[in-house]
């Protein structure tokens, strides 16, 4: 595991309120190098942030400093195949959970608060349920699913459904094994990302390109492994998280978007309520899309800090 201060990059694009992490280091997770980024005082109480699919830790460059200013050592990591972490031969939900545990183990041996957005929210919900001795409180930012479970079917039919998922997933991995992401200018990459994040400003998306893409000889490319695809968490369905919610053993604060977006989950309080633990606190933010912490960083940070106090 190595650690260093983050050096200034002459090609970084400025954005109001954004601060690059103060430190970066790497954690070994089963032989894979996982990049870990930190904001705030190293001696402050730690909390863990998990990003969503197709994102990276630097998407918290506005939100994380607000939590650090509230007195926390804020730690996030680039999930395998994302950002500055190494690409892997295969990607599975279980591998992501193991990576999260390895990062958490490098931060604290005691229970700490965890915050996740989208896929990261479901990931940390899973972790909090499985390892409540490691998690003191959970904040889930639009990572709570409400899609209906598969109806009860015969076991041989259930196995057939899973077999097709696995075959499709492995076929995709074979086809893209030697693929490379399409290059472009910074502005082109920002516009492409904007098609998936239509509510985020072009200025913010340019900032993300500078933080999360690499400049090759033929142009800029996102660092994301080209084999990744939506829903590419391996044989896992988001709605399985619903089964864990009623007995969640740690306090939970949840945020939901009110505007549908391509990368969003379209979960509503009404559909979620039957599955929530009794003391869960849920807020639906009006006129807000999937990237709640980017659209409303100050409001979300204030609510989170009150919840953690």
Show the residue positions of the predicted features.
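Catalytic histidine-centered segment of alpha/beta-hydrolase-like enzymes
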Residues: 285-297, 301
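Conserved loop-alpha-helix segment in the C-terminal half of the alpha/beta-hydrolase fold
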Residues: 246-288
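Alpha/beta-hydrolase fold catalytic core
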Residues: 1-47, 69-72, 109-110, 145, ...
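Alpha/beta-hydrolase
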Residues: 179-263
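Flexible "cap/lid" loop of the alpha/beta hydrolase fold
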Residues: 129, 136-181
């Amino acid at each position: 595991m190595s650690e260093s201060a983050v050096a200034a990059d002459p090609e970084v694009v400025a954005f109001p309120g954004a601060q690059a992490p103060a430190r970066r280091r790497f954690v070994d997770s089963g032989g894979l190098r996982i990049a870990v980024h930190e904001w705030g005082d190293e001696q402050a109480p730690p909390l863990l942030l998990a990003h969503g699919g197709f994102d990276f830790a630097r998407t918290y460059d506005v939100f994380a400093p607000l939590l650090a200013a509230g007195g926390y050592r804020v730690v996030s990591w680039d999930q395998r195949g994302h950002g500055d972490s190494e690409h892997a031969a295969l990607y599975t939900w279980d591998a992501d959970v193991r990576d999260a545990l390895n990062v958490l183990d490098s931060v604290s041996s005691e229970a700490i608060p965890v915050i996740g957005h989208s896929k990261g929210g479901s990931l940390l919900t899973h972790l909090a349920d499985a390892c409540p001795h490691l998690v003191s409180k959970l904040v889930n930012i639009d990572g709570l699913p409400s899609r209906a479970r598969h109806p009860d079917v015969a076991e041989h039919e259930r196995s057939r459904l899973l077999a097709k998922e696995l075959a499709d997933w492995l076929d995709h991995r074979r086809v893209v094994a030697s693929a490379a992401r399409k290059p472009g200018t910074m502005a082109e990459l920002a516009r492409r990302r904007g098609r998936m994040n239509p509510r985020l400003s072009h200025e913010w998306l340019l900032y993300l390109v500078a933080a999360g893409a690499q400049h090759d000889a033929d142009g800029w490319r996102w660092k994301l492994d080209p084999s990744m695809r939506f829903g590419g968490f391996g044989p896992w369905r988001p709605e399985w998280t619903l089964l864990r919610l009623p007995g969640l053993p740690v306090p939970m604060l949840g945020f939901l978007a009110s505007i549908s977006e391509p990368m969003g989950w379209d979960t509503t309080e009404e559909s979620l309520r039957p599955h929530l633990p009794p003391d869960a606190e849920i807020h639906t933010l009006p006129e807000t899309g999937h990237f709640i912490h980017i659209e409303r960083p100050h409001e979300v940070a204030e609510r989170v800090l009150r919840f953690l106090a």
